Swiss-Prot record:
Organism the protein comes from: Synechococcus sp. (strain CC9311)
UniProt function note: One of the primary rRNA binding proteins, this protein initially binds near the 5'-end of the 23S rRNA. It is important during the early stages of 50S assembly. It makes multiple contacts with different domains of the 23S rRNA in the assembled 50S subunit and ribosome. Forms part of the polypeptide exit tunnel.
Signal peptide: none
Gene3D superfamilies to which the protein is assigned, alphabetical: 3.40.1370.10
GO biological process: translation
Keyword Translocase: no
Top-level taxonomy: Bacteria, Bacillati, Cyanobacteriota, Cyanophyceae, Synechococcales
Region (Disordered): 40-85
Name by which UniProt lists this protein: Large ribosomal subunit protein uL4
Domain of life assignment: Bacteria
Amino acid sequence: MANCIVRDWQGKEAGKASLDLKVAKEASALDLMHRAVLRQQAHSRQGTASTLTRSEVRGGGRKPYKQKGTGRARQGSVRTPLRPGGGIIFGPKPRSYNLAMNRKERRSALRTALMARIEDLVVVKDFATTLTTPKTKEIIDALGRLDVSATSKVLIILTNPSEAVRRSIRNLETVKLIAADQLNVFDLLHANKLVVGEDALAKIQEVYGDD
């Protein structure tokens, strides 16, 4: 179990919260998180790269010149991979890059990654609830009050962020917003700081704390 200090929108201490998630064994934790990140990155690939082989490129199979008497290497087709406009040897073809990983392993990797970043986690009560119109400066100032730089890689985790909050955050290149029930290992490990709403922390405990 990890205890966290809860801060309000002004950056002042407003209580305490706890997070109790079951993590993987130390001997296998690093490998588990590594496989989860590899799987996530592999699944983001479209796998649509495609090249034409000598049987698919445009043009006939005409023999460019006679077999003997030219002094040149023999050629059997104008579409051989050795000639301009010919086919590609061992080029990419559409394929799936998906990697298999058990559901229990995926959830364990996510819980382990989250608990590993507990020192970089900032819990905020009522994050931007007073924000009615998009104001990026308000988000920057609030992060500053929480001792979090808006120019560093920040992951903000909320339950149901309003449209004003979404539009305020999307102007910040290094700040990413994600829902509490849609966490992923890559974002948790990639960010320098995790800013979590108090209700989002409770949602995380509810969704991922049942194993």
